[in-house]
């Protein structure tokens, strides 16, 4: 995931992204609603071959995938592990183990030896945790994590954490950006009230009794 993040004071190519340089918007809360709250900047979908000079215009293609090959691999691996275990394939030719091994090898992990993967190869629960972590890394910042942690019933009360990099000291300090307080019913989203009014047998999800969300008829 670190390949997708840029932190304050981190070196990217020939530039140092600093949170302490005056006269810029860089750094934690330097300018309201414009600066980073966490000390992180996202780099995943940025092209590194553009002219970064202020005021310059670069004509480069920017592609946003609708569905990715690796996304389908990960979905298959998760389902296969739940249905047939880490190495079962039900005659399809590929097991969860095979798929995750291919994904990790493509990322430069394991190659001829992958001890972590092998530790999970004989245990469904361990393989499930590995697959979840692979989804977290491979699909980060692509809109999957929000839904994944809810369908897995993960703890939603983890605080949002940030880092303050110290370039001179080669260290960083972690801090809490925001506390999160969720109730169990929040694993499910509310049904818009306008939809409930259309069908009397439709019951609002538990905990959202007084939800006043509406949908557009457009």
Regions found by a protein language model. Give the residues of each.
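Positively charged, low-complexity/disordered segments
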Residues: 1-7, 217-218
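Acidic/polar-rich alpha-helix caps and helix-coil junctions
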Residues: 8-9, 13-216
């Amino acid at each position: 995931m670190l390949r997708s993040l840029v932190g304050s004071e981190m070196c990217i190519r020939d530039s140092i992204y600093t949170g302490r340089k005056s006269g810029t918007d860089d750094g934690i809360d330097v300018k309201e609603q414009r600066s980073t709250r966490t000390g992180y900047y996202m780099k995943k979908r940025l092209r590194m071959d553009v002219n970064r000079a202020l005021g310059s215009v670069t004509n480069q293609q920017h592609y946003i995938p609708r569905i990715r090959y690796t996304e389908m691999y990960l979905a298959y691996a998760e389902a296969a592990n739940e249905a047939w275990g880490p190495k079962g394939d039900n005659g399809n030719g590929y097991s969860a183990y095979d798929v995750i091994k291919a994904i990790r090898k493509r990322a430069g992990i394991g190659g001829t030896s992958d001890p972590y993967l092998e530790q999970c190869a004989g245990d469904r629960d361990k393989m499930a945790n590995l697959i979840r972590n692979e989804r977290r890394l491979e699909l980060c910042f692509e809109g999957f994590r929000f839904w994944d942690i809810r369908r897995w019933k993960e703890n939603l009360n983890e605080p949002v954490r940030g880092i303050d990099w110290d370039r001179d000291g080669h260290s960083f300090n972690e801090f809490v950006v925001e506390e999160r307080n969720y109730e169990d019913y929040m694993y499910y989203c509310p049904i818009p009230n306008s939809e409930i009014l259309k069908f009397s047998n439709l019951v609002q999800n538990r905990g959202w009794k007084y939800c006043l969300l509406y949908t557009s008829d457009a």
